[in-house]
Structure formats: C-alpha cells, structure tokens
Swiss-Prot record:
Sections of the chain in a coiled coil: 184-215, 264-361
Places the protein is found: Membrane
Protein name as annotated: UPF0496 protein At3g28310/At3g28320
Organism this protein belongs to: Arabidopsis thaliana
Pfam families: DUF677
Length: 384
C-alpha cells in the first residue's frame, strides 16, 4: 500500500521538521542518535533471529510499538493536560487600576476643596486690605466730631472679615486628609501584593512554556519512535517471510501514527501559542503596578506639602481674626485701634504670601497627579 501524493508530501514535511528539531535540541538529537543505534541493533538482531526462526511479528509489535510508544505518548499527554488552561485574565490588576484612579480622583477632590477654601481666604484678604486702606483714610481725617467715630468705616470692613470666619476651620479638610492617608496605605499594600502576584504568574507561565517545549521535543521523539517502529516492523516481516496481509497491516501503521503525531503537535502548538500570548500579556502589564507606585509617590508628596501649607494659612487667618477682634474691641480707643491696624497691615502681606504658596502648590501637584494618571492610562492602553 503506497502513500498518496498528499500524504507523502505531509510525511516528508514532518520528517524535515523532526530533523530540524533534532538540530536545535541537544536532548532530542541525543534521543535520535539512540533511536538510530537501536534501529541498527534491532535490524541486526532481527536478521539473526530470522535465520533461526525465533522472531515473530507480534514480538516486533510489542517491543517497538506497544511498550515504547505508549510510554512516550503518556508523557506527552501528561504535559498537554498540564498546559491545557485558558488564557489568563487578570481581574486583580483591573481592580487595582480602578482603585488607583479612584484614589487620585479623591486627591484631586481634596485639592479642589483646598482651592475653594483659598478663594474664601482671598475674599478675606480683600476685606483686610480694604480695612487697611480705609484706616489710612480715616487717619487723615481731622475734626471728626463727637458723634462720628474716626475709625468707624475701618471697623465696618473688619466686621466683614470677622463674619466670614476661617474657611479652613470646619474640619472637612482634616477628615479628608486622614481618610486619604488610610486609602493610600491600603492601595500601597495592594500594589505590593499585585506586583508579587504578577511576578509569580510570569514565573509559572515560563515554567509551563518550558514544559510545553519539552513536550514538543517529546512529540518529535514519538514521531522518531514511530518511524523506528515502522522500519523495524517492515524489516521483521521481510526477515520472517510473513505473508502479504500482515505486511500490508504494518505498512498502514505509519500513516495512522503520523496523523496522531500531527494531532499531538497541533495541540502542543496551540498550548504554546496560548502560553506565549499569556506571557506577553503578563509582561505587558508587569510595569503597571510600578507606574501606579510612581503615581502614588506624586500623590504622597502632594498630600504631604499641601496640608502643611494649609495649616500655616489657617493659623495665619486665625491670627488675623484675633487681631481684628482686638481692633473691634478697641473701638473707643483710637490708639489701640491704630496699633491693631498697623499690625494687620503687616499680617496681610504674610497672608498674601501664604495664599500664593498654597495656590501654586495645589496647582503643581494637581498637574503632577493628572500626568501620572495619564501615564498609567497610556501604559494600560499600550500607547505609552
């Protein structure tokens, strides 16, 4: 029974693939050498035994096919079973990224609250400046009169500042800062866990790829063993002079094994492709936790600087309110009012500086955090 042209062509391709694999894999090359030697020895043995009539086709089948080929096929099957999982989907990483974006959004919300408080502080700053300007006008007046108080208009402006109060005094920012710190600590722990998990996933996938590569070698071993079995069987038939029906049965054995070998290789190649795709995906997402860490560092730095400056601004406004109270309380004493207003004139300069510092810091770290968010998004989408 001859092979069809199509089968012959495919068989030749597989033989070429087997030979190429032997050239690339030392272990497979060593196996092939042993197979070649074993084939040679078996041919010699069968030739001698044929002359004495002590060999049978059944023994050839048992020696070459049943025992050796089944054992090798079992090893291949074990590896295929080990590697037959679906492509990895990292729900943990997706959750981590979502938490990171939520965290940075909360930070930006806090900065927005700070900005709103600063706007209120600027309004208070204008009241103080107006009071200082009015104080200078009032100081220039002469002969105020008994019914008119010299610094009446000045005190009216100060009352506006007092009515406004301290925009940083409601405790909202303090609560937000404390919650933000806890959230960042929790997120940092999750980032660390995810980095370790991804590293472990990569290590496991690499091991499985190594196993599949080994299985690929084994599949070539199977093919080599099949070819060996076919050659040995045909030689045995010729040596024993068994009739045509049995010879024909042996001839049809190789195409079946070749087809089985093709099936094994098809599964192995699919498994290897899936694992390589999984490894590629893991390596792609591996930098993401590190990028999130970078973003958190920017977050942390901002959350460290802003509260400090906010506290300083809050203290400055509290000090101004106390001085305003003193000035209002000294309503009947022009000398005391004058001293308090001169102090406020110096303090409002410090207030202006503090407001500017907070505004610049919030703007700077808001920009940094937004850029960090963008970099993470670019890494996730593969555009960065």
């Amino acid at each position: 029974m001859a092979f069809s042209k199509d089968k012959t062509s495919r068989y030749s391709e597989h033989v070429d693939a087997y030979r190429a694999a032997c050239g690339h894999h030392p272990d497979l090359k060593s196996f092939d050498s042993k197979i070649q030697q074993r084939t040679s020895n078996l041919i010699d043995s069968l030739t001698v035994e044929a002359k004495t009539g002590s060999v049978s086709p059944h023994a050839v089948h048992k020696e070459v096919i049943d025992i050796h080929l089944v054992e090798v096929s079992k090893a291949v099957a074990d590896v295929i079973t080990e590697c037959g999982e679906e492509v990895w989907e990292n729900g943990t990483l997706q959750s981590l990224v979502k938490d990171y974006f939520n965290s940075t959004m909360e930070t930006l919300k806090i900065f927005e609250t700070v900005t709103q408080c600063v706007h209120e502080a600027k309004r208070g700053q204008r009241y103080i400046k107006a009071a200082v300007a009015q104080f200078k006008k009032d100081s220039e007046e002469k002969d105020v009169g008994v019914k008119k108080k010299r610094y009446g208009k000045t005190l009216e402006e100060l009352m506006k500042f007092k009515a406004m109060g301290n925009p940083f005094d409601d405790g909202l920012l303090k609560t937000q800062f404390e919650l933000m710190n806890k959230q960042q600590e929790s997120l940092f722990d999750r980032v660390t866990e995810t980095k370790e998990r991804i590293a472990k996933e990569i290590e496991e996938v690499q091991k499985r790829i190594s196993n599949v590569n080994t299985a690929t070698i084994v599949s070539h071993v199977v093919f080599g063993a099949a070819a060996f079995g076919y050659a040995a069987g045909c030689i045995a038939l010729m040596c024993t002079g068994v009739g045509a029906p049995l010879g024909a049965g042996m001839v049809t054995l190789l195409p079946v094994i070749v087809v089985q070998w093709v099936g094994v290789n098809y599964v192995l190649n699919n498994s290897l492709e899936a694992l390589q795709k999984q490894l590629k995906a893991l390596n792609k997402v591996k930098p993401i936790p590190e990028r999130i860490t970078e973003g958190m560092e920017a977050d942390k730095e901002g959350m460290k600087s802003v509260p400090e400056q906010v506290d300083e601004l809050k203290d400055q406004i509290s000090s101004l309110l106390q001085t305003v109270d003193d000035a209002i309380g000294s309503e009947g004493d022009e000398v005391d009012v004058k001293l308090d207003m001169e102090s406020l004139e110096d303090d409002v300069k410090t207030l202006t500086t503090k407001i500017t510092e907070v505004c610049e810091t919030v703007a700077k770290y808001s920009k940094i955090i937004k850029e960090a968010r963008l970099h993470v998004l670019e890494k996730i989408t593969g555009t960065g």
